[in-house]
Design a protein with these regions (language model features):
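A carboxyl-terminal module marker
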Residues: 195, 200-378
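Amphipathic alpha-helical segments
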Residues: 46-61, 173-187, 305-312
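Short histidine-centered catalytic/ligand-binding loop motif
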Residues: 39-43, 156-172, 291-299, 354
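Short secondary-structure junctions
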Residues: 61-69, 188-196, 377
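Class II aminoacyl-tRNA synthetase-like tRNA-binding/catalytic domains
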Residues: 2-152, 161, 216, 221-230, ...
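Conserved short secondary-structure elements within globular domains
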Residues: 129-141, 186-192, 319-326
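Extended C-terminal subregions enriched in glycine
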Residues: 169-176, 180-206, 296
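A conserved active-site cap/scaffold subdomain adjacent to cofactor or substrate pockets
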Residues: 150-151, 155-174, 179, 183, ...
């Protein structure tokens, strides 16, 4: 029987208090993202159903279920997991920093640390017991805007550890477990394969691809936890395997979902369509509205930060943002400036948008672009 192990961290509570006291753009954005529901724990959501399917895999019958903080120290997320100092995940262009030391969690694998710090788990390790854990929930990364990506999404991961002196584990053991995971999601007749991959915290590592309408699509990654990473967390003499995957990607494949935003819809007509293994049928497709914006900004401009601005002001009405052009001209703009042109596609699942309401949003985006990025609108 699985046990649920919630983890509370006073450092997270303190970070939330500091965040609540701020009124800047970034603080408001982060509070909004944290307030979004955890769909992996929302009955009726296909992401919740995916979690339940994976939990039902026989190998996980007695695994602990751990719920971890959403605000974590960057040192735990990156240093303990052997992320190189120059890894892009450490950058503010990829990760949401609460302050210099704390971030919104970027990967659910951070549960390794929190699980191993629990007093009862330390006691089990001292007794030489084997350990198994599953973890799932929201993660946060700055990302592009299109029908397949959001900056708030959900991951699920798990691992198994056993003392070295009680036997050996190999990549074949992990492949056997992952085969059961894939079949629990896509059915016993699905076609899948394993490829070599690389992750900072596992070695060797692999990825799993599943065949979808004749094409191979990556769905999850895994590997054997590096001994150096386990040692960073105070554990030696153990071997194991681990895996992790994004829930949205699997749901999109299972339902042939045309847009990731549909997973968050409160429209009952849409929610009735969100059933795993059943192709989504659009209840009504309302026309999109397109607007372009061109501006000149300093060269340290980061597009991912601009995507966040558009999300802040356009919300769920923004379907996609495309970079149409990036242009440098020292004579025209100056050697320290660069010109960008972006195209934003607006579309509602519930109604036809008017030009007037889109223009209002777009004007607000123009004004905030000037304020936040010292931009000159062209």
């Amino acid at each position: 029987m699985s046990r649920i192990l919630p983890v509370t961290d006073p450092a997270e509570a303190a970070a939330l208090d500091r965040l609540a006291a701020r009124d800047d753009f970034e603080a408001r954005r982060i509070r909004r993202m944290l307030s979004m529901p955890d769909l992996s724990r929302t009955p009726g959501s296909p992401l919740h159903e995916l979690v339940e399917r994976v939990k039902s895999v026989p190998s996980f019958k007695d695994f602990d279920i751990i719920a971890i903080p959403e605000i974590v120290p960057a040192s735990i997320s990156f240093d303990l997991f052997d992320f190189p100092p120059t890894h892009p995940s450490r950058s503010t262009s990829d990760t949401y920093y609460i302050d210099e030391k704390h971030i919104l969690r970027t990967h659910d694998t951070v549960f390794w640390y929190y699980y191993l710090q629990l007093p009862e788990i330390k006691e089990r390790i001292a007794r030489g017991e084997s350990l198994g854990t599953l973890c799932y929930g929201k993660v946060y990364r700055k990302d592009e805007i299109d029908r397949r990506h959001m900056n708030v999404f959900h991951q699920m991961g798990g691992w198994y550890l056993m003392p070295e002196d009680k036997g050996n584990l190999s990549l074949d053991d992990l492949k056997s477990v992952l085969s059961d995971v894939v079949k629990s999601i896509f059915g016993p007749n699905c076609i899948y394969r394993f490829n070599v991959d690389v992750f900072p915290y596992t070695d060797p590592s692999l990825e799993v691809e599943v065949q979808v309408e004749g094409e191979w699509v990556e769905i999850l990654g895994g590997g054997m936890p590096k001994k150096s990473v386990l040692k960073n967390m105070g554990v030696e003499g153990y071997v194991g395997w681990a895996f992790g995957f994004g829930l949205e990607r699997l749901a999109i494949i299972s339902m042939k979902l045309p847009d990731i935003r549909l997973l968050w819809s409160e429209d009952e007509r849409v929610k009735k369509q969100l059933v795993l293994d059943r192709p989504f049928v659009e209840v009504s497709k309302y026309p999109s509205v397109t607007r372009d914006i061109s501006f000149v900004v300093p060269k340290d401009f980061v597009p991912n930060n601009y995507f966040d601005l558009i999300r802040d002001l356009g919300g769920d009405l923004v379907q996609e943002v495309k970079l149409l052009d990036r242009f440098e001209n020292a004579e025209k703009f100056g050697s320290d400036k660069v010109s960008y042109t972006f195209r934003t596609v607006y579309q509602s699942f519930e109604r036809t948008l008017t030009s007037a309401e889109v223009d209002k949003i777009h004007r607000a985006i123009e004004e905030d672009t000037k304020k936040r990025f010292s931009a000159t609108i062209r």
